[in-house]
A protein has these predicted regions:
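Bacterial carbohydrate/catabolite-sensing allosteric modules
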Residues: 1-49, 53-317, 325
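Amphipathic HAMP/coiled-coil signal-transducing linker helices
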Residues: 317-321, 457-478, 484
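Helix-loop-beta substructure at the N-terminus of cytosolic sensory domains
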Residues: 321-364, 538
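A short, aliphatic-rich beta-strand micro-motif
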Residues: 397-400, 404-413
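Short hydrophobic/glycine-rich mini-motifs in sensory/regulatory modules
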Residues: 412-422, 433
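Amphipathic alpha-helical "output/dimerization" segments
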Residues: 428-448, 457-462
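Conserved long alpha-helical elements within nucleotide-processing catalytic cores of c-di-GMP signaling
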Residues: 477-500, 507-534, 543-547, 551-552, ...
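Catalytic-core segments of nucleotide cyclases and related cyclic-nucleotide turnover enzymes
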Residues: 518, 563-570, 574, 585-621
Length: 621
């Protein structure tokens, strides 16, 4: 099986699924044994540079040399450093690289011939509609498509003996708001309007038309407008916008054809173009082209709106479910269930295992991924839950079953720190609902909130441990008797489980301190604490009650277990010449006595043992 990598950056919050659809359609039409791996981010959407760093890190995940061909959709990468970095990696990977709608020396260009349709539009405007004053309403100055369209515009001006001073070029973005701003600036400047705005795309054209109407102008009565791309907002706008049709799915299909020719050793042109067509409409003074079915369009929009509402409701429901979760495992279960309701064939979550620990000092990678710590947290495929022992096992599964399928890899990160990534198989819903960023960001924000909450809980637990620990001996202190032992006693008492209360006091400790010094006395206390804790049965506690007094507590107690505990402790300490007195009291399951009452009885038992030992020594003397 051959593997193709598609490196892409979303357009704002949207993902261009048409490339993927065209690629997979062509692979299946030809019945080729090929899999598509898409690595997509949204590095141009956030204003937070560190967040964008975390997005672009997904490009560091693949071993590019392991692919048979690579397709770069880099026209939306606005970070110059990131753009140069990925281009350099691709130039050095030793694999044939195709670039979509962006010419890069050494790569094969696949896309539209941006110059030819602009020449055709300019000729039409000049010869058919008599335009003599032009403005090119452009997109980003450094965007390749915009650059090519500007170049063709300039060629035509030169051909007609016109200058840029009289026929200027405007630079902005590719969005609707750019067109609105262009029109406002013209109105506010008081400049004479041109005969035509030649726009870099349909978004800009629609913005100009709409804003012109706000100021009392009408297109095409007062001036003409043309667009590019043949988006719905061109075909169904009022006025219908003259535009250029380019089929993005055909670009995807052409990518497959070019790679097949390369793999077969056949000659391939450096630039590979899809057919494009100028579509003339009302905005340039031509009649409605009649190529649209308004009722069918409205029907599709209504159905799409209903479906979008359903998808949004599912996302809102997921958000509410995740907010009620107590841990990451539960969150991942809900997310996987959510994706099973969408039109996709599978999803896998690969995350750094440090996510689950949520230690307060945890750091995640900024460059690349901590592969030795990556685990498959959860996933499904074809409505069946899947589990993998390692990421390597998942990767082998993807390769073994990947033929004629598309895998989408998107980053999971907390700002610049990379936690892992999500793998989605055949996300067909993205064609009708391209706002995948909304889904992805909701999931990531929930994971980050859970992580920070766990960090706070862990930090609070550490502080509580310090608060409940005796600094000298390291065992629980008297506060822990109230905070830990007392609640434990109440729990076992309610369940009818007998417990043992043990009261311990060091014999003649004042004399030890006076004779050998306080440092020696401290070591005696430390040793008593160690032995008490080491011999304490499971689920039990030992605490320093004060001075040379200690308390032991353990459940599921019997007289034999209690006697065994005291015998072992005293035997070990006696061998080290450390003498203690111990009193034990067993609780009565279901009784009404308080723990303090039982402790008082244990204290009395300890005191009796201490007195007996003193009497015994007197008799010996």
């Amino acid at each position: 099986m051959k593997k193709i990598a598609l490196i892409s950056d979303g357009w704002r919050r949207m993902i261009t699924y048409a490339w993927v659809d065209g690629i997979i359609r062509r692979i299946r039409e030809l019945d080729e044994d090929i899999a598509l791996y898409q690595y997509n981010c949204y590095g141009n959407w956030s204003k937070d540079a560190l967040h964008n760093t975390g997005e672009y890190n997904i490009y560091n995940l693949p071993d590019l040399s392991a692919f048979d061909g690579i397709i770069l959709d880099g026209s939306n990468i606005v970070d110059v450093w990131q753009k140069e970095k990925i281009v350099e990696r691709l130039q050095n990977c030793g694999v044939p690289v195709l670039s979509l709608d962006w010419y890069i020396s050494g790569f094969y260009y696949v896309g539209a011939d941006n110059r030819r349709p602009i020449r055709e539009l300019m000729t039409h405007l000049y010869e058919v509609h008599g335009c003599r004053r032009f403005v090119f309403a452009g997109g980003p100055e450094d965007a390749f498509g915009n650059f090519e369209r500007v170049a063709a515009y300039c060629e035509c001006l030169k051909k007609y003996g016109m200058t840029l001073d009289d026929n200027p070029i405007l630079c902005g973005d590719y969005d609707y708001e750019t067109g609105v701003n262009y029109m406002r600036e013209y109105v506010h400047s008081g400049s004479k309007l041109p005969d035509v705005f030649v726009c870099a795309n349909d978004n800009i054209a629609a913005g100009i038309c709409a804003e012109a109407e706000q100021w009392g102008y009408r297109v095409p009565d007062d001036f003409l407008v043309t667009g590019f791309d043949n988006l719905d907002k061109a075909a169904y706008f009022r006025p219908q916008i003259t535009t250029v049709f380019q089929d993005r799915e055909e670009i995807g299909k052409l990518c497959v054809d070019v790679l097949l020719r390369i793999w077969e050793g056949k000659p391939v042109e450096e630039r590979n173009y899809i057919p494009v067509t100028c579509i003339y409409g009302e905005s340039c003074g031509c009649p409605n082209n009649g190529m649209v079915n308004y009722r069918e369009y409205l029907r599709e929009k209504i159905v799409a709106t209903v479906k979008k509402d359903e998808d949004d409701s599912l996302l809102v429901e997921l958000e509410a479910q995740m907010a009620r979760c107590n841990g990451f495992r539960e969150i991942f279960e809900y997310i996987v269930d959510y994706f099973q309701k969408l039109r996709c064939d599978g999803v896998y979550f690969v995350v750094d295992r440090k996510l689950f620990a949520a230690d307060e000092d945890t750091d995640f990678p900024v460059e690349g991924y901590d592969e030795k710590n990556l685990v498959v947290a959860d996933g499904f495929e074809n409505h069946k839950r899947m589990a993998f022992a390692s990421v390597g096992e998942l990767n082998r599964h993807l390769e073994e079953t990947g033929s004629q399928n598309a895998y989408l890899f998107t980053p999971i990160h907390f700002r610049e720190q990379s936690i892992g990534y999500l793998v989605m198989k055949n996300g067909r819903f993205l064609y009708d609902n391209p706002y995948y960023y909304d889904i992805h960001s909701t999931i990531v924000k929930t994971l980050e909130t859970q992580f920070k909450q766990k960090q706070l809980e862990n930090a609070a637990n550490k502080l509580q441990m310090l608060y409940n620990r005796d600094p000298l001996t390291g065992i629980c202190n008297r506060i822990a008797y109230t905070d830990i032992i007392r609640p434990a006693f109440a729990k076992y008492q309610e369940k009818g489980i007998a417990c043992a209360l043990v009261f311990v006091d060091a014999d003649d400790f004042k004399s030890v301190n006076d004779t050998y010094g306080h440092e020696f006395g401290d070591q005696v206390l430390i040793r008593i604490a160690q032995v008490l804790e080491e011999e304490c049965p499971q689920q039990g506690y030992v605490c320093r009650y004060g001075g040379d007094e200690f308390i032991g507590f353990f459940p599921y107690a019997t007289s034999e277990k209690a006697q065994q505990y005291t015998d072992h402790v005293q035997s070990r300490l006696t061998k080290e010449n450390i003498m203690i007195s111990i009193g034990v009291e067993l609780t009565f399951a279901g009784g009404e006595e308080t723990i303090d009452e039982y402790l008082s009885l244990a204290d009395q038992n300890m005191y009796r043992q201490k007195q007996m030992r003193k009497e015994s020594r007197k008799n010996i003397d």
